[in-house]
């Protein structure tokens, strides 16, 4: 399993994600939580967090939470759906990813996003194809 510095390194290898500042809150087998400061590069008109940024970060930690299991060396998104419940106008923003089910080649993941007032702002579900060593 990887740690917070590994997680930051994985984000740094991605053209978009490398612009995201975050701090790992915890990493466990099948679970990741990160805290993202609400900075200008994540805002859209109206001073709220851009929905595309919410989805990109959610998708990233969704897939990475599957990689916390032994033997999984990479993953790709098969499907990803997001429901936006309320705009995020206050940070920091907490992203919590949990693997609901994992098989030989597919993982099913849920990602919850909470705003700076700890209100549920979005819920995503993702399906990831797994590459094993």
Swiss-Prot record:
It holds the Pfam family 4HBT. GO terms for molecular function: hydrolase activity. Its EC number is 3.1.2.-. Keywords: Hydrolase. InterPro entries: HotDog_dom_sf, PAAI_dom, Thioestr_dom. The keyword Hydrolase applies. Belongs to the thioesterase PaaI family. This is Putative esterase TV1331. It comes from Thermoplasma volcanium (strain ATCC 51530 / DSM 4299 / JCM 9571 / NBRC 15438 / GSS1).
